[in-house]
C-alpha cells in the first residue's frame, strides 16, 4: 500500500532542529509538515517563518506548510518567497475573505495549493474550491495544539471526500491524532498521506528510521 508519511515539525526537538531534519530524512520521511500559527486564527503560536525557511534550506524533501493564520493573502508572498517550487501551502478557507485569490497566488508561484478542513467545517462550504486545489488536509482534531484526541465524526467527512476526489482531482491527507489504526483503516480506502506527530513518531525510544519502517509495514 503506497502512502506518504510527513513529519509534524512542531513536535520535533527545536533545540537541535538541524539534527531532527537530518535524522528524519535519513529515516525515510517523505516530507516535512510546518505549522504556522498566529495566535489569532488559533489560540496558540507554533513554528516561525525562520523555522520554515531553515527547514526549506536544510532538506531537498518537500515541505507542507499549514497556515493557521488570519487573512493569509495579506502576507502570502513572505512565505512563497522562502519556499521552493513543488512545496505545498495549505490555507483555511474560513480565515480568508477570498480564498480562491490566495490559492491562485500559490499556483502562480509554482507551488501546490491546498486547503485545510476543520472538524466543524462542512464539505459543502468548500466544494467550489475543491476544483482548484490539489490537496485537502482533513483535520481530525481542532487546530492549534498538538496531542489532542481524535474526533470520530471526521470519518464521515473523509468518506464524502473519498467519493469525489478522483472526479475533482485532489488527494486527501490526514492531520491530527494519527495512530496506526487510522492508517490501517484509511490508507487502503484512498487517503494519500498522514501527518505524524507524538502519537506515532516523536518522543519514542526507537530511531526514526525504525519507526517509519514499522509504519510502512503495517498489515492491512
Language-model-detected regions and their locations in the chain:
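Glycine-rich phosphate-binding active-site loops on the catalytic face of alpha/beta enzymes
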Residues: 89, 93-96, 137-147, 189-211
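N-terminal active-site wall of soluble small-molecule enzyme domains
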Residues: 38-105
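Alpha/beta enzyme core
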Residues: 20-34, 78-86, 126-139
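Conserved, mostly hydrophobic/aromatic
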Residues: 17, 24, 35, 79, ...
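Hydrophobic faces of well-ordered beta-strands that scaffold small-molecule active sites
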Residues: 3-9, 32-34, 63-67, 87-91, ...
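Glycine/Thr-rich beta-alpha phosphate-binding loop at enzyme active sites
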Residues: 39-46, 119, 127-159, 166, ...
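Alpha-helix-loop-beta-strand connector modules within alpha/beta enzyme cores
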Residues: 45-65, 108-114, 154-172, 214-220
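Catalytic cores of alpha/beta
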Residues: 21, 71-82, 121-130, 178-194
